[in-house]
Regions:
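Short clusters of hydrophobic/aromatic residues that line enzyme substrate/ligand-binding pockets
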Residues: 7, 115, 272-273, 277, ...
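Alpha-helical transmembrane segments of integral membrane proteins, especially early/N-terminal helices
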Residues: 21-30, 90-94, 261-272
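Transmembrane alpha-helices of multi-pass inner-membrane enzymes
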Residues: 35, 357-402
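Transmembrane helix boundary and interhelical junction motifs in multipass membrane proteins
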Residues: 172-177, 275-278, 290-291, 359-362, ...
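Long extracytoplasmic/lumenal interhelical loops at the membrane interface
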Residues: 259-302
Length: 428
């Protein structure tokens, strides 16, 4: 990497061609994810249908949100990517909104994460994640030196990330962990010195061990008394995940234990091709079948083939993002698109690992597939930003092709007159 406006020495060389342009491939992946979302959310929303008494209400709302999201993709896609730096202003705004959540936040599923706007519940943590990634990418691009990122970049990035995660963690531990992990990987890509990354990894590992021990062994009554009610939920999830013994009926937590059990049943009964779209049985027993556990419903209905196909879509998206970064000539765009890709795919990985029982329940939705409000719209903005940077790369390659063609034409014109000179015969 060079400085902000420099050319990467491993950047575009010559004119590269591919069978399918990057931006078209990303559009196709996006549309596939939306199509799967429509089918599976419609199937998995049976609990919402029972509660509301409206068969078409949940899917109509979801379709409307996807349409608004697609419009957002198109709008952001047409914004020149140099303007994305202005989105850094969202960082202090998101911090203020996260503080406001503690005061006026709506309590949903035992957590204060949303601000109720009437027509939609707004989740400031989603905006905070986006603003943090944009800001970190900007800092890394501005502080690149010949041998890597300036050591001060590490301090600035840690300060911003700790502030954001600190405002999120009390009500949404998994989102804070997701953001911290994404920033760490982005710093690795941004060539932050290994000594600093190693120190951060050691501190992070120690905090995880201490945090798990603290949450696991301090009685829930203590957490309730000091107002940290979410600790009780985390304690239950950790105990359920690591404890293989049978849970007594008196201690059975319907919200967590039953969901995990029914998700396991959904996957175990799926086989290769599944039961077919709309034929899920466990959706009627999973209260979050349309969100946290939608991947289990996908596997139940579409089988292992369908589950693998969804995972491959996210892998292909990450590969396309890597290709955009490899062909880009500006370090800010490289770090921004890479950070978005890491955050997007890491969140999908969290959701999938929870559904198959490898991780404790986190509450992270499956990007662009789970039913959601703010998360869906912000994910659509991510896709729009990726497409905008992809368009910049395409324009760059086109410009390079034109310059190369002009250079070859000029060289051929210089050589042509020399070849047309006819030597004169010597007079005798």
């Amino acid at each position: 990497f060079q400085a902000e406006d420099g050319i990467r020495d491993i950047g575009v060389t010559g004119v590269q061609t591919c069978a399918l342009p990057i931006y078209k491939a990303i559009w196709i992946i996006y549309l596939f994810l939306c199509l799967i979302s429509i089918v599976e959310v419609f199937s998995a929303s049976s609990t919402l249908t029972y509660k509301s008494g409206d068969h078409w209400g949940p899917i109509t709302n979801h379709l409307t949100l996807l349409m608004v999201g697609t419009i957002a993709v198109w709008i952001v896609h047409n914004i020149p990517c140099r303007w994305f730096k202005t989105f850094i202003a969202l960082l202090p705004i998101s911090w203020a909104l996260l503080i406001a959540v503690f005061v006026i936040g709506a309590l949903t599923n035992g957590a204060k994460r949303w601000i109720d706007l009437g027509f939609i519940q707004f989740q400031p943590s989603e905006v905070a994640k986006m603003a943090t990634i944009i800001t970190v990418a900007f800092i890394l691009s501005r502080m690149q030196e010949e041998n890597g990122a300036n050591k001060k970049a590490f301090k600035y990035i840690c300060g911003i990330t700790v502030t954001t995660c600190g405002l999120i963690v009390t009500e949404n531990l998994s989102t804070a962990v997701l953001l911290a992990g994404s920033v760490f990987l982005l710093m690795f890509v941004g060539r932050v010195p290994f000594k600093q990354l190693g120190l951060l990894a050691g501190i992070g590992f120690a905090c995880i061990i201490i945090g798990i021990g603290t949450i696991k062994y301090i009685p829930g009554e203590v957490w309730d008394k000091i107002g940290l009610h979410r600790m009780v939920t985390w304690q239950s999830r950790l105990n359920n995940h690591f404890d293989e013994s049978e849970i007594p009926a008196a201690k059975f937590d319907i919200d967590n234990d039953a969901q995990i059990a029914h998700a396991n049943i959904a996957i175990a009964s799926s086989h290769i091709l599944g039961k077919g779209p709309g034929n899920s049985v466990q959706r009627d027993f999973l209260s979050q079948a349309f969100s946290d556990f939608i991947y289990a419903i996908i596997i139940e209905e579409l089988g292992l083939v369908g589950g693998a196909f969804v995972a491959i879509l996210y892998i292909l998206l990450l590969m396309r993002i890597a290709k955009i970064a490899r062909n880009c000539d500006k370090s800010y765009y490289i770090f921004l698109v890479t950070g978005i890709g890491i955050l997007f795919v890491l969140q999908a990985t969290f959701n999938m690992l929870v559904a198959v029982g490898i991780m404790p329940v986190t509450g992270q939705p499956l990007p662009l597939i789970s039913k959601g409000g703010t998360s869906t719209l912000v994910n659509c903005v991510y896709i729009g930003m990726i497409l905008s940077i992809s368009r910049y790369v395409n324009d760059l390659k086109r410009q390079q092709a034109e310059e190369l063609l002009a250079q070859q034409t000029e060289q051929s014109q210089e050589v042509a007159p020399e070849n047309n000179i006819i030597p004169q015969e010597k007079s005798v």
